[in-house]
Regions:
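Basic, helix-initiating cap at the start of DNA-binding domains
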Residues: 1-58, 65-71, 88-91
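Key DNA-contact positions within bacterial/archaeal DNA-binding proteins
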Residues: 77-78
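Hydrophobic alpha-helical connector segments
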Residues: 92, 106-133, 151-156, 170-173
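C-terminal regulatory/oligomerization modules of transcriptional regulators
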Residues: 1-29, 154, 179-187, 212-223
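Amphipathic alpha-helical segments used for helix-helix packing
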Residues: 124-146, 182-190
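Amphipathic alpha-helical packing segments from all-alpha helical-bundle domains
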Residues: 138-174, 193-208
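Hydrophobic alpha-helical segments that form the core
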Residues: 3-6, 125, 166-188, 194-206, ...
């Protein structure tokens, strides 16, 4: 049975283990646990930080524990003292990404009168700014048991609230935002396509009347 992200294997296992709070239990949980990076010991945080840089520089296909060890200037076994497997390290990266998005979503929920539109724009911008981490998070199978407890839930809760607790609407907005974002990252649109116009049209179609979510046909200044 593999350890969770940041959990050491063998002697001293659990020294870097994420703190388990109410996050895994209920809706209020994600807000009660520390941010992902704060749940690692300093050496594990350094590994995650450098791993993220390596991922963005070279992509997932070239990402390996050996390449990471080279960049850190250590031998691979040093990494395995903090992350039991490559899958555990990948899950740590994904957890950090979820919590970064969650913080942005939570801010939009309190600062925007069109929170669902604002969150969708944040989601797209996050993918553009972190393309390989985004692909890691959303374009491959997700090993949920390895995630830091509460990280995925924390990113989901603001979107559901922005959709007026309508989970179907929240899922539809996510599906649209992901489809546009991943196609854009993979250069699948014609070079002359007006993606901002398509984005506004798609978001408006989710709630043509404006509705309780505050979506409008005009979008939210994303062009």
């Amino acid at each position: 049975m593999s350890a969770r992200p940041g959990q050491a294997s063998g002697e001293g296992a659990g020294r870097d283990a994420p703190k388990r709070g109410a996050a895994a239990a209920g809706r209020s949980g994600p807000a009660t646990v520390p941010p992902a990076m704060d749940r690692f010991r300093p050496r594990a945080r350094e590994i995650v930080t450098v791993a993220r840089q390596l991922l963005e520089d070279e992509g997932l296909d070239s990402f390996s524990m050996r390449r990471l060890a080279d960049r850190l200037g250590v031998r691979a076994p040093v990494i395995y003292k903090h992350f039991a497997s490559k899958s555990a390290l990948v899950a740590a990266l994904i957890s950090v990404g979820f919590e970064e998005q969650a913080a942005l979503f939570e801010a939009a929920l309190t600062s925007s009168d069109q929170p669902l539109t604002a969150m969708a724009a944040i989601y797209r911008a996050y993918g553009r700014d972190n393309p390989n981490l985004y692909r890691l998070m959303y374009d491959r199978d997700l090993e949920r048991p390895l995630l830091l407890p509460g990280s995925e839930e924390r990113a989901v809760v603001p979107a559901v609230r922005a959709a007026g607790e309508d989970r179907d609407l929240a899922r539809a907005a996510w599906a649209f935002a992901h489809g546009m974002t991943i196609l854009e990252l993979n250069n699948r649109f014609p070079a002359d396509a007006d993606l901002d116009a398509a984005w506004r049209r798609g978001m408006a179609s989710l709630d043509p009347s404006g509705g309780v979510t505050g979506l409008e046909r005009s979008g939210n200044g994303q062009d």
